[in-house]
């Protein structure tokens, strides 16, 4: 009987799409829960039968997909951020210099492996050719900063690569929305409003490419790089409502620093409020300004993530 406490998830970048490198040094992942699955697409025969029985179920394709939920910690999910941004990190000249990631057009693929270590023999599901269709972050008062990585994969096998070794998990502390969010900037000015919760979603709008003679997807093609989110703040001033009413664009920046001094700065360069409501929802409740926002590009760049080591 398998136990969740004996499940290991690991991954490695693919040089060739859908091909796991030989004797891979797999990165052991940190995670909360997962929904990685082998999805088989079936169609049913519509043949009319005189005995009134239904026709056979026919397998016409398969793929892999699912989510990995996580607690954000510095340096742990940078490979998935690169996939979500469709670009590579640009490192600074010195190890202590910041590295920068901006949205681009580079498709990055990973092999992701889920192993059930307490099964005899051990069971492994190997998800090949995985892209990150979406990554999201949730920042809520008095809570850890959590997120979800939504993967789409080309194919799956049950054979673990020969000679695989495992790099250890990172050891940086989970980040929280109380002491690790050092500032939230609106147009480079610290926000004075009290934020209850906010979220960021980065979506690549990947779609599968299917071909005659292929049981699995041949590839994925990306659509628009879409950045959006939600923000609930205590209704204290008309500032955000006036921005919503006038369709005023704003730059949103979130600065996060762990207890060791490692930093992330997420910049969304041009956003507008898409919705915003100010409702009294019941007796003895606070009135919240609850809005959603959507971002567009400035010179082709919609989002920028900067990481700086301590």
Where are the language model's segments positioned?
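Signature of extracytoplasmic/envelope-associated structural regions
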Residues: 1-310
């Amino acid at each position: 009987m398998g136990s969740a406490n004996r499940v290991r998830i690991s991954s490695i970048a693919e040089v060739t799409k859908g091909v796991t490198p030989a004797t891979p040094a797999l990165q052991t992942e940190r995670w909360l829960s997962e929904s990685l699955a082998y999805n088989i697409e079936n169609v049913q025969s519509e043949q009319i039968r005189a005995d009134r029985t239904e026709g056979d179920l026919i397998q016409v394709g398969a793929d892999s997909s699912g989510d990995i939920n996580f607690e954000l910690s510095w340096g742990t999910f940078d490979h998935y951020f690169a996939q979500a941004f469709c670009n590579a990190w640009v490192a600074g000249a010195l190890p202590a210099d910041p590295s920068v990631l901006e949205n681009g057009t580079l498709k990055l693929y990973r092999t992701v492996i889920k192993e059930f270590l307490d099964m005899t023999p051990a069971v492994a599901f190997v998800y090949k050719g995985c892209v990150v269709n979406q990554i999201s972050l949730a920042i809520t008062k008095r809570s850890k900063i959590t997120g979800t990585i939504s993967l789409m994969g080309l194919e799956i096998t049950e054979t673990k690569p020969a000679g695989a070794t495992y790099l250890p998990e990172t050891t940086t502390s989970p980040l929280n929305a109380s002491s690790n969010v050092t500032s939230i900037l609106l147009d480079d000015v610290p926000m004075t409003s009290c934020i209850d919760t906010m979220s960021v979603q980065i979506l690549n709008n990947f779609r599968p490419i299917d071909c005659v003679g292929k049981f699995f997807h041949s590839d994925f093609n990306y659509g628009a790089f879409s950045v959006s989110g939600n923000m609930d703040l205590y209704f204290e001033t008309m500032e955000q409502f006036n921005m919503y009413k006038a369709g005023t664009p704003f730059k949103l920046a979130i600065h996060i620093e762990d207890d060791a001094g490692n930093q992330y700065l997420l910049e969304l360069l041009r956003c507008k409020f898409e919705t915003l409501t100010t409702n009294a929802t019941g007796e003895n409740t606070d009135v919240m300004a609850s809005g959603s926002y959507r971002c567009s590009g400035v010179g082709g760049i919609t989002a920028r993530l900067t990481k700086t080591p301590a």
